[in-house]
Amino acid sequence: MKYIIAIIQPGKLDAVHEALGAIGITGMTVSEVQGYGRQKGKSEIYRGAEYVINFMPKIKIELAVETKKASEVIETIQKTAESGKIGDGKIFALDLKDALRIRTGETGSTAL
């Protein structure tokens, strides 16, 4: 199993959600987060004053999938979330040792 974490632009969430649903993904966790990468925030001018925004708003998507499905999920997120601009985000794939469905006690990939 793989645990996939994607950090994407907030405006891309609906498209990514729809695209993942189209390939059979039935669940994920979504969080509003803040962070920065190479762009290190940005400066904006508001009413003549310059403001530095150090942390950019992002969306974090987390999902657990069977190993054989991981490449398809990663490719789907990448293609859907890409705008070609700085700040598009990152995708991380980690090995997932086990999962447990609390309600039924199922473990492993059947718990997904």
PLM features per residue range, with description:
Residues 1-112:
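Positively charged, small/polar-rich N-terminal and surface patches that mediate targeting and assembly
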